[in-house]
Amino acid sequence: MSLEKTSKAAIVADNARGANDTGSPEVQVALLTARINDLNGHFKAHSKDHHSRRGLIMMVNRRKSLLSYLKNKDATRYRDLIAKLGLRK
């Protein structure tokens, strides 16, 4: 389940720190969050798709490690990103 080119570009533009920024933790976490949300919809219809579930778990763990890195590096950027994406309650 990959993202469409236009939606991916919109996510990158919305979360980028600079003009050509595609690799900052904020952008990576936002892209992973979008893919995770898409896969959650997939699992509502295909609950026994365990092969894709493994990919989902790997994405969640990757996002978790990126968020941990960002929290240790710059706590204000971390809090802003969490609020923007609505990840924590």
Curated annotation (Swiss-Prot):
Organism domain of life: Bacteria
Keywords: Ribonucleoprotein, Ribosomal protein, RNA-binding, rRNA-binding
Cited InterPro entries: Ribosomal_uS15, Ribosomal_uS15_bac-type, uS15_NS1_RNA-bd_sf
Gene Ontology molecular function, alphabetical: rRNA binding; structural constituent of ribosome
Gene Ontology CC annotations of this record: cytosolic small ribosomal subunit
Entry keyword annotation includes Ribonucleoprotein: yes
GO BP terms: translation
Oligomer status and interactors: Part of the 30S ribosomal subunit. Forms a bridge to the 50S subunit in the 70S ribosome, contacting the 23S rRNA.
Its biological purpose: One of the primary rRNA binding proteins, it binds directly to 16S rRNA where it helps nucleate assembly of the platform of the 30S subunit by binding and bridging several RNA helices of the 16S rRNA.
Homology family: Belongs to the universal ribosomal protein uS15 family.
Protein name, per record: Small ribosomal subunit protein uS15
Gene designation: rpsO
